């Protein structure tokens, strides 16, 4: 028994010593954060190293890019929370109504995403520094914060674009700091690192999920449904730091608490920026309207979504002059994002109970009393089958529930094709019915609303995106409740048998899917 006790004590001592001696990014990578850009695979190496040292970290590879780079998440919390991590996750889904049952835990989930634009190059560097601080067992303050939250950290949403930029920059950079923006290292050639392998902007793909990175990430997102999501970006070298609260237009579906928590986060982060003597701005440029961003998509899924914008971008490199002659360094840019990330962790800890309570209230309202103008949407059965199939695929990706209609007459609604209100129509079992009385009510209403309300004439992106228009479908929106009668059987296309030796093909064209024959 004494030998067993001694062995257990020795094992605990060795484990504790290993974690206590956790290497810093500088010790592991061989250079100070901000001295050069880290290749994606070296970031993965560091995350794997830290996760191997700390039992309170779960590292997940949730997918891979077109160029076969791994997409990873790091999940961190206290030992108590990590021991019941799956219960916390499923309890959170119960809160949304996506799973049945009553939750027994009250732990909010704080998700932070970096480098959706590859050449907004500080993102992954800041993620590395943030990860080290969150994983450091000797940081008593942070470890106390982790008792009241689960943190999910995605260090690089767009590894292909990120490496396209960092590989180019590391090849062209001077041996000494060269802040002159006319030098080669400050003039990235086409196509640049902003987009992914197929030159698609992943920051516009949250709702549509056209790209593999988005498809794989959103599958994970739907499994957790966080209370908080921070989306870390960069802007031009002459811009100061942007933090929430956001600018107008602000979508009418946003709740008072979502606005309030943006203010809470902004005030706390501004406090630290004031202490550091750093410039920042709020309530300008970055609005909350278009539904496929890393702030609005979480907002329409019940979270507090926030964009964070550091000044610098790919042009700044590891250091560049701005318009007033100051040198904007990579290390100072890391400090900006690092400060905002830890501010979010601090405020999640301080408001953990309310984040969970308001989140649960949000989804209860969705299912029982949706507040949007339209309560139901009908896609007519005679619509283009290929386009209907694409729409249903999109709804499935976003967890939006739908079903088939029944034979009903005397209905009136907004007709998308004509733009007229109170148009009489009837339904049949060939139609698709999407009710707003469901967990994904807000996202449903936002994606289908024909005319989003605008309170400001200047917006950051497009102002209309209604799905019936996007897919060219005959559809109606009702201001009354209409429930589906059962599951809808998706249209399938039977393969055409080709006989003989064809010299050409003639196929009906109703959508891009008809090219696959």
Where are these regions (language model features)?
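Bacterial Sec-dependent N-terminal signal peptides
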Residues: 1-24
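Short, conserved secondary-structure transition motifs
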Residues: 149-165
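Active-site-proximal loop/turn and secondary-structure-junction residues that shape catalytic pockets
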Residues: 157-159, 234-236, 312
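Aromatic- and acidic-residue-enriched carbohydrate-binding clefts of CAZyme catalytic domains
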Residues: 182-200
